[in-house]
Amino acid sequence: MSASETDRWAWLLVLCFVFGCNVLRILLPTLSSFISRVLQKDAEQESQMRAEIQSMKQELSTVNMMDEFARYARLERKINKMTDKLKTHVKARTAQLAKIKWFISVAFYVLQAALMISLIWKYYSVPVAVVPSKWITPLDRLVAFPTRVAGGIGVTCWILVCNKVVAIILHPFS
């Protein structure tokens, strides 16, 4: 394929990239949750701690407070200590999960921005499509930016339009 043939298909390339980025943006929370779960294996330890707390609470319910106060108090302190330990463990895991999700989101948006900038750089002087100039008469210079071709649709305008259209189409899925 020659350079002029690839320039002719620039509109489809931009549309595909914009569509892909918007689909990934919708799937970003699910994707980051999955990656976080893969990276964190502490949930098993938390469920084990919860099971221990439940068994101790069941044992506590069988102990008579009046007859065996020392055993009852010891078991209650043990439950409180284990509950506090579980709470701190959950807080630490939640903070780490938030950091992982934030990093994934930032990485995605940086990648998306780099992709859009590279598309604008590559197709800076080439119109993505050319339509009769009377169709876009009041806005022809704005729409043609940065190509300066009469009736041309510049890559920046095309990216904005594609982003809006794809966002509207994918809105029910988000």
From Swiss-Prot:
Gene3D superfamilies noted in UniProt: Helix hairpin bin (1.10.287.660)
Major localization class: endoplasmic reticulum
Any GO molecular function: protein-membrane adaptor activity
Superkingdom as given in the UniProt entry: Eukaryota
UniProt-annotated location(s): Endoplasmic reticulum membrane
Annotated region (Interaction with GET3/TRC40), positions in chain: 39-97
Cytoplasmic side: 30-99, 170-174
Keyword Membrane in record: yes
Task performed by this protein: Required for the post-translational delivery of tail-anchored (TA) proteins to the endoplasmic reticulum. Together with CAMLG/GET2, acts as a membrane receptor for soluble GET3/TRC40, which recognizes and selectively binds the transmembrane domain of TA proteins in the cytosol. Required to ensure correct topology and ER insertion of CAMLG.
Family per similarity comment: Belongs to the WRB/GET1 family.
Protein name, UniProt field: Guided entry of tail-anchored proteins factor 1
Protein's organism: Rattus norvegicus (Rat)
Taxonomic placement: Eukaryota, Metazoa, Chordata, Craniata, Vertebrata
Gene: Get1
